């Protein structure tokens, strides 16, 4: 049975993530006294920094919730209320941060390999996330990075 083309699958997956986030955030507001959202936000960031769960292209809100022994509603609410992002935006932020780190260590890496290495399954999604998080396309950013490093080298 032939699979669906990536151009079809990945936008559908992103829509599924967005729909899941919307469903989670439409639940009754949680009482902030019962769970410290700022503390949870810090735990989410620590977990992502330490274990790099964002490298998994199939990561879900529930994966983080399970690791923190809480429920996905709390996680989604902490991300939205304390970081001003939805889950997908947060994961993309971490992936782009990692892409920049990897590129700095290996500036000869191909963009499709870099995108895959940091958890993106689609170049379209990678390019869009990169632009939203840096203000540059990946090609523009790489060109500027090389120029800056050459200027530093010449100094």
Residue locations for each model-derived region?
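Membrane-proximal linker segments that couple transmembrane helices to downstream signaling/catalytic modules
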Residues: 3-116, 129-132, 139-155
């Amino acid at each position: 049975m032939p699979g669906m083309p990536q151009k079809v699958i990945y936008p559908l997956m992103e829509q599924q993530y967005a729909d899941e986030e919307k469903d989670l955030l439409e639940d009754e507001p949680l009482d902030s006294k019962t769970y410290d959202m700022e503390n949870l936000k810090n735990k989410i960031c620590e977990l992502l920094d330490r274990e790099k769960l964002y490298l998994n292209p199939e990561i879900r809100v529930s994966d983080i919730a399970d690791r923190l022994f809480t429920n996905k509603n709390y996680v989604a609410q902490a991300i939205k209320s304390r970081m001003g992002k939805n889950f997908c935006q947060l994961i993309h932020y971490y992936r782009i941060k990692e892409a920049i780190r990897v590129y700095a260590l290996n500036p000869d890496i191909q963009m499709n390999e870099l995108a895959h290495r940091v958890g993106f399954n689609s170049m379209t999604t990678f390019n869009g996330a990169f632009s939203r998080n840096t203000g540059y396309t990946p090609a523009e950013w790489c060109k500027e990075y090389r120029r800056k490093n050459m200027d530093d080298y010449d100094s």
